[in-house]
Amino acid sequence: MSPNVDDGERLHRRSFVFDLHIHGPGFVPQPFRSVWRGLTVGAPAEVGFDALRKGGVDAAVAKAVGDPIVTRWYLGRSPWDAVEAQLARIERQASDAGALVVGSVDGLAEARAQGTPAIVLGVEGADAIGRDVDHVDAWHERGVRVIVLVHLRDNVLGTTCLPWQRYVGPLPVRRHAAAGLRPLGLRVVERMTRLGILVDVAHADRATLLAVVDAATAPVVSSHTGARALQDFPRYLADDELRAIASTGGVVGLWPYRYRHAGVRHITELIAHARHIADTIGPEHLAVGTDMNGVPGVMAGFGDETDLPKLTAALLDGGFSDREVNGILGANALRVLRKVEEHAHRRPHR
């Protein structure tokens, strides 16, 4: 056993552990959820938010999915209403697990002081906004504090790095527009920044990501990704993309994804990604995004949040200091949310 296992456990319990990207169980409605689970038999079993407490996780961003890969299965509902149904479900699940839904950094601190896991609401795939930028305000009023602009298909805001067909296999994909951030996407980014909603470019292609960063006046994140220098997987980021996100003061989340031949096979490979990213942009720009309940597969030895203490020990084994690991586990992400909040408060609201 690694000598850092006990040290990792102690450090994990002392740290503010913040997962930037999870989903609530059952976000795909039945009977379609059973079909999805049948197609992804290697995926870990879905778990409830009680796994956060068991895994020593203080907070997580739980995201509804706003693109048609999920919303189309909410039969008889508009994409907007499908997202609302998911957000309401997350709130019920949080309540059932004894977690608090919060909308500010102060709320995160209050939840931790009470010894209660905190849930921050998010949306992955802003397709449901349609062409109405004021929908961003409605989501903010609803409590949403993180939005992933694009998900598994291009939308009216920008373009994705990996359409859903490419996860399934070499299927044809019709791209309807040139890659990059659309004018409407720019307006959405500006509105999010003004309101204090964190911009998440996970799933964005290179052109969209760089355009978002170019327009950014507050930190930008990619909540679940890896280093493309280590594997040529479209969901991973090239070094200049990593540097672009770091230039905003943002973070990139370590992602335990493994499906078919893509992603990390085991925790040693995940630490290699952490090491490369830290060497490229500094450990202060690293975070964690497990994608709990949202991935078709994960690395060996990892099932859900209860396995996160293994990551803490492995980071120590990988040469990261206690302070650096504390940052990766959550302090860096907390810093980003605080800066996004402060930036919004400094801006005059029209």
Regions found by a protein language model. Name each.
Residues 219-225:
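Short hydrophobic/aromatic-enriched beta-strand-loop microsegments
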Residues 199, 215, 245-247:
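Short gly/pro-enriched beta-turn/loop segments at secondary-structure junctions
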Residues 215-218, 343:
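A short linear boundary/processing microfeature
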Residues 1-174, 228, 232-288, 292-350:
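N-terminal hydrophobic targeting/anchoring segments and the immediately downstream early-domain regions
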Residues 172-213:
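Loop-centered beta-sheet repeat module
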Residues 16, 195, 218-219, 286:
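The start of beta-strands in P-loop NTPase/AAA+ ATPase cores
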